[in-house]
């Protein structure tokens, strides 16, 4: 029996009709209907017969089936119960796919990887991420104690640009710092709205993030470090001096201490957050230990 690619307008429409499926806007459902785009995603991910893939939001399986053809195993998390019978149908030719009907943010990913991908030499996250929760999903996966080698993911263009942004640019912010702390980021391609059904309201981008062997800087408390960096961008037009006065408890009373702390790290208090590198924030984080008055 010959199987037609799912990622075509005609096959997707036929499946929608067959299952009486209606898109849920609340779940950010936009299905890929262009095999060429999917092939570029596969190519960028460098998956092969030794790779285990984690997919989030497989939809009707348009990307999943191509992953199954190229990877050793695919584990796909789908939150929408209505899509489970569709996926069981569309992916029936492939015995290397596991569909998990669960919210990726609530799932025990380490256990799932140990159960389904334990015999894979490397693990990649390859997905057309639901746009409304792209950032929480990525941060959750980056911070898992799971040997993920990298990500090739489709997302809203604006979010992708923030992940990949360089210091001093408009898009650079706390998300750039977290992503680049854990991974080396690069843009794969920009994707037009026309390759989705239904078309999203925003432009899309595919971004590649490869896990670093070691984080970009060494800190003893990642959560505290990220909070400190995020505070510098609380009000982008304000100086870091002003932002940190608002961030720290009794910051207004400790203006002079904040100024001394910034200067001890070699940072001009009049600078804005977007001009500070990740290394600058790491220095600030270390220097803060010398100023016991600065608490939050």
UniProtKB/Swiss-Prot annotation:
<dbReference type="GO" id="GO:0003723">
    <property type="term" value="F:RNA binding"/>
</dbReference>
<feature type="binding site">
    <location>
        <position position="30"/>
    </location>
    <ligand>
        <name>S-adenosyl-L-methionine</name>
    </ligand>
</feature>
<feature type="binding site">
    <location>
        <position position="78"/>
    </location>
    <ligand>
        <name>S-adenosyl-L-methionine</name>
    </ligand>
</feature>
<comment type="function">
    <text>Specifically dimethylates two adjacent adenosines (A1518 and A1519) in the loop of a conserved hairpin near the 3'-end of 16S rRNA in the 30S particle. May play a critical role in biogenesis of 30S subunits.</text>
</comment>
<feature type="binding site">
    <location>
        <position position="32"/>
    </location>
    <ligand>
        <name>S-adenosyl-L-methionine</name>
    </ligand>
</feature>
<keyword id="KW-0694">RNA-binding</keyword>
<dbReference type="Pfam" id="PF00398">
    <property type="entry name" value="RrnaAD"/>
</dbReference>
<comment type="similarity">
    <text>Belongs to the class I-like SAM-binding methyltransferase superfamily. rRNA adenine N(6)-methyltransferase family. RsmA subfamily.</text>
</comment>
<dbReference type="InterPro" id="IPR029063">
    <property type="entry name" value="SAM-dependent_MTases_sf"/>
</dbReference>
<feature type="binding site">
    <location>
        <position position="57"/>
    </location>
    <ligand>
        <name>S-adenosyl-L-methionine</name>
    </ligand>
</feature>
<dbReference type="InterPro" id="IPR011530">
    <property type="entry name" value="rRNA_adenine_dimethylase"/>
</dbReference>
<dbReference type="InterPro" id="IPR020596">
    <property type="entry name" value="rRNA_Ade_Mease_Trfase_CS"/>
</dbReference>
<keyword id="KW-0489">Methyltransferase</keyword>
<feature type="binding site">
    <location>
        <position position="128"/>
    </location>
    <ligand>
        <name>S-adenosyl-L-methionine</name>
    </ligand>
</feature>
<keyword id="KW-0808">Transferase</keyword>
<keyword id="KW-0949">S-adenosyl-L-methionine</keyword>
<dbReference type="GO" id="GO:0052908">
    <property type="term" value="F:16S rRNA (adenine(1518)-N(6)/adenine(1519)-N(6))-dimethyltransferase activity"/>
</dbReference>
<dbReference type="InterPro" id="IPR020598">
    <property type="entry name" value="rRNA_Ade_methylase_Trfase_N"/>
</dbReference>
<feature type="binding site">
    <location>
        <position position="103"/>
    </location>
    <ligand>
        <name>S-adenosyl-L-methionine</name>
    </ligand>
</feature>
<dbReference type="InterPro" id="IPR001737">
    <property type="entry name" value="KsgA/Erm"/>
</dbReference>
<keyword id="KW-0698">rRNA processing</keyword>
<dbReference type="GO" id="GO:0005829">
    <property type="term" value="C:cytosol"/>
</dbReference>
<protein>
    <recommendedName>
        <fullName>Ribosomal RNA small subunit methyltransferase A</fullName>
        <ecNumber>2.1.1.182</ecNumber>
    </recommendedName>
</protein>
<keyword id="KW-0963">Cytoplasm</keyword>
<dbReference type="InterPro" id="IPR023165">
    <property type="entry name" value="rRNA_Ade_diMease-like_C"/>
</dbReference>
